[in-house]
Amino acid sequence: LIGDFILVNKFSYGIRLPVINTKVIDLGEPERGDVMVFRYLKDPSLDYIKRVIGLPGDRVGYYDKHVYINGQKVSQDPVDLYQGVGQGANMTGAQLNHELLSVREHDILIMQERPSIEGEVIVPEGHYFMMGDNRDNSNDSRYWGTVPEENIVGKAFATWMNWDASNNGIDWKRLGTLIN
């Protein structure tokens, strides 16, 4: 959420040389469903956080509010209508769904009345297709393309604090929550 302070494991995908960002020790690759922090393509001074949807070589499509990976529709089950509070209040009334990527289930928000960017892309080697869980209010790979491996900062794993300015302070319920 807006206002989250995130803990990131910068070594999840390998050890890199500072400044030139070259990987010197490979400790693994991003997996579908990982929540990853990366340098924004259009302004590398900004870090973005999104979910890995497409891996190198994947064909990723987004049609009628559903993700397709290599021609297979990703499972999505409706849960309830989202009741946002504080900084999440602007999405109140969105459909809260469980989405299953590989073996990882996570929540997403869908606003049926909002138009969505639809289309298909083949993820180039060394790149990743990223999407936000707030599907109809997310600036992600549907708009600016795939993320090159060298832009990866690390894997997000917990929210250590949230500053909710609209509720005048710390959102105590989010402290220490794990990111799935």
Predicted regions and their residues:
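Soluble "head" domains of membrane/secretory-pathway proteins
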Residues: 2-180
